């Protein structure tokens, strides 16, 4: 939100209705699906956000193009309760653990505030097929979310957590977790994916 936009809208509001309205510097939303770029990671649990972004792009007729080498970015409009909502759909190319660089770059460039950002990511704490939406909160051990929290300077944005189930715990928990998120879905699970 810029001082100029507040002043401009304050003046317009006085002339029109005597109400104060503040319009965001950008009325766009940013929807970012997290994952790792490259064919090596296609179809892995950690790329659940990329898969969701691809489904949304197809549904909303969004075409991706490069944004500063940091993300594939597309623009669209969706009808939400009779209202047209403009949005950017992003797939960061920075690898999962540096997702914040791409999200912060897009956010800054298009002046999108954190409360207009939605991040879609895999979540091992949810069973496969479960989806939870939450606003803000902890990263829950997810390195992509930690990176976004750091880069935006706040955890106050929406997350769509997509369940991928949990790796076996035990003596080699870290290795099991890495292998799990970078592994593919089983045959029964693949049948349920779009």
Where are these regions (language model features)?
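Short, Lys/Arg-enriched N-terminal segments with co-localized hydrophobic residues
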Residues: 4-23
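Conserved TIR/SEFIR loop-to-helix hotspot centered on a Trp-containing motif
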Residues: 139
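A charged, well-structured terminal subsegment
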Residues: 173-176, 183-194
């Amino acid at each position: 939100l810029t001082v100029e936009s507040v002043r401009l809208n304050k003046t317009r509001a006085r002339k029109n209705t005597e109400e104060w309205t503040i319009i965001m510097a950008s009325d766009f939303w940013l929807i970012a699906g997290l994952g790792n770029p490259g064919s090596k990671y296609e179809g892995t649990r950690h790329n659940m956000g990329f898969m969701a972004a691809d489904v949304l792009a197809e549904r909303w007729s969004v075409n991706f193009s490069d944004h500063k080498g940091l993300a594939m970015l597309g623009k669209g409009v969706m009808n939400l309760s009779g209202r047209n909502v403009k949005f950017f759909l992003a797939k960061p190319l920075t690898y999962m653990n540096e997702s914040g660089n791409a999200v912060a770059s897009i956010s800054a460039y298009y002046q999108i505030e954190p409360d207009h950002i939605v991040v879609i990511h895999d979540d091992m704490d949810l069973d496969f097929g479960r989806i939870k939406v939450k606003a803000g909160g902890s990263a829950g051990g997810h390195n992509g979310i930690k990176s976004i929290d750091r880069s935006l300077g706040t955890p106050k944005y929406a997350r769509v957590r997509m369940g991928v189930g949990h790796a076996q715990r035990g003596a080699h928990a870290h290795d099991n977790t890495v292998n799990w998120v970078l592994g593919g879905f089983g045959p029964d699970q693949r049948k349920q994916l779009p």
